[in-house]
A protein has these predicted regions:
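PLP-dependent aminotransferase-like
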Residues: 1-34
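Short acidic, glycine/serine/threonine-rich loops at helix termini
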Residues: 2-6, 50-53, 78-85, 113-116, ...
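Helix C-cap/helix->beta junction micro-motif
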Residues: 7, 63-64, 192
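Active-site phosphate-binding strand-loop segment of PLP-dependent enzymes
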Residues: 23-72
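Active-site pre-lysine segment of PLP-dependent enzymes
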Residues: 25-27, 51-63, 75-101
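Active-site-proximal loop/turn and secondary-structure-junction residues that shape catalytic pockets
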Residues: 45, 74-76, 108
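Active-site C-terminal subdomain of aminotransferase-like
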Residues: 84-196
Length: 196
């Protein structure tokens, strides 16, 4: 919502299924019109931790020739390692032909300091729209790949350091531990009257 507000874009919020808390694909399909510029799915969404049917959203994107963004800000550093951790997931990423971009926050399950996030693009076609270039600045051409112009590199260096330290195996192990702990807590809650 923040980016849409900055850019003057109206968001059409698609209803979710009351039981699964996943986006209603039929409702999403009905809401697509000639002003639709993108479809977005959560993998997972923050309040309930459920993953939208990214395959279905990808199919809609292909059908209507619309880019599909996967918001994996919360779980991007978990779901990317689920298969290797022994918890297979349905495809949610660039394995799906309609997915054009994915976001992930490095400061959540990436274990990096707060202040950096990732946006990955299927191709440079969409990434090129992210850049801002102002050729008439008195100091020369001013270009920046983000809304924030000048940024300190410390957070990015710290993020890189954490990723190098943990490595793929570290993220796989963390994912396995988190999922197993979540399942143990879920089982324990089942035995507590009044909780579900």
């Amino acid at each position: 919502d923040k980016a849409a507000d900055l850019l003057g874009i109206r968001i059409s919020h698609v209803p979710v299924d009351e039981v699964t808390r996943r986006v209603d694909l039929r409702a999403m399909s009905r809401m697509i019109n000639n002003k639709t510029i993108m479809l977005v799915g959560s993998a997972p969404q923050f309040p309930h931790g459920t993953m939208d049917n990214i395959q279905g959203i990808s199919d809609l994107g292909l059908k209507y020739n619309l880019p599909v963004h996967v918001d994996a800000c919360l779980g991007g550093f978990l779901i990317a390692f689920m298969d290797d951790a022994g918890f297979p997931l349905k495809p949610f990423d660039f394995r799906l032909a309609g997915v054009t971009s994915i976001s992930a926050d490095t400061h959540k399950y990436g274990y990096a300091p707060k202040g950096s996030s990732l946006v990955l693009y299927r191709s440079s076609f969409y990434r090129n729209y992210q850049y801002f270039c102002y050729p008439d600045w008195p100091g020369g051409i001013y270009g920046t790949p983000t809304i924030t112009g000048s940024r300190a590199g410390g957070i990015i260096a710290a993020c890189w350091g954490v990723m190098k330290l943990l490595g793929r195996e570290g993220y796989v192990t963390a994912t396995r531990d988190i999922i197993n702990t979540t399942r143990r807590i879920t089982e324990a809650v089942q035995d507590v009257p009044g909780l579900k």
